[in-house]
Amino acid sequence: MTYHPELAPRRRSWLIATPLMFVIVLGIAWSGFWYWAAGQAETRINDWQAQQASAGRVFICGKQTLGGYPFRIEARCTDVSVEVKDSRTPVALKLKEILVVSQVWDPKLFIAEFTGPLMASDPGEEPYATATWTLAQASVRGTPNQPDRASIVAEGLKLVDAAGQPLFDAKHSEFHARVQFGSWPNNPAIDLAANLKAASGPGLSPYARDPLDADILAVLHGMKDFVVKPLPVLLREWQERGGRFEIQSARIAQGETLATATGALSLTQAGRLDGALQLNVIGLEKLLPAIAQQKGVALSLERAAPALNAIDRAVPGLGARLAPQAQSISAGLLGLLGKPVDVEGKRGVSVPVRFSDGNASFGPIPVGQVPAAF
């Protein structure tokens, strides 16, 4: 049989070309969409910077770039400087770099990574505090009108003063916030969680010199927006809405001392702290001397004498056996003012900590006035 090429079946080249053309068109369309989304992101960043500047908070990037094609949008800001002028004490902040990433298919989730150091100073002056870390990341899900949750995690966080003296450090620290489902915006309630590992604050408090671990679960009621404002203004608005900070569970362990607490705190119209905490402690006798050394918190037997005298009248002879002039404040509190309680299988002491219009008391002992928040 003679072969005739013209009689051979023709290949359907369009079957090959059509998928290829579809991929090319899809790639062009996706590229156009990505560049449009990147442009929108840059516009939102610029608008946000202008809005903050009008409110007295100036954010400046030494260099700002956008990238992440094809599936992410990355906004990178290097040589960051922030000047906050709307607070009682203006502050200037400097940070090496911020990288914010969002997936194109999930634009409500933002992940940020911070590169230190972070330096704080008075405007135009040398830094008075510097923070460093090995890793610092944050994530935010939601929109300003419908927030969902936010988290921040830091590893190897260290804070020092101008002389290089340590103020605070933590091997691991993380904070989480989540809006309770259905509570926003009419009756907002925000679940809070904090975790610290090997944290110490020698420059912040005398009883935070030794490393401690902390786990805290709480609920913040009454926070209706997340607009950045001066802290006094934010707290005043929170108080006017009947805001309340509910501590569901707090656990702090430091050496042989262990403390757990529950309770609720709020602010009065004058901005003073109000509420009560139930504190359960193992090793209270080790905690009290450090508290007594803190400036402005004078835990002394002279201040405890009225309470001890009242107990002596109720139980004649008990005060004589534990006379103030013969016993320390620790022994007096443990023997007379503390209520025995089981704390994680060990014997401890339960003491109420009360705040009434800013006046703080440890059990029946007044310990001073907490400054007004606004």
Where are the regions a protein language model picked out?
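Loop-centered beta-sheet repeat module
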Residues: 2-6, 20-23, 156-219
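Extended terminal
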Residues: 2-20, 62-63, 234-240, 250-252, ...
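Hydrophobic membrane-insertion alpha-helices, especially the h-region
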Residues: 17-34
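Alpha-helical transmembrane signal-anchor/signal-peptide segments
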Residues: 36-53
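N-terminal beta-strand/beta-hairpin edge segment
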Residues: 54-185, 250, 261, 283
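Extended lipid/amphipathic-ligand handling interfaces
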Residues: 64-66, 95-105, 131-145, 170-185, ...
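Outer-envelope beta-barrel architecture signal
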Residues: 73, 188-190, 271-273
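Flexible, membrane-facing loop/turn or short amphipathic-helix motifs
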Residues: 81-90, 118-129, 156-169, 179, ...
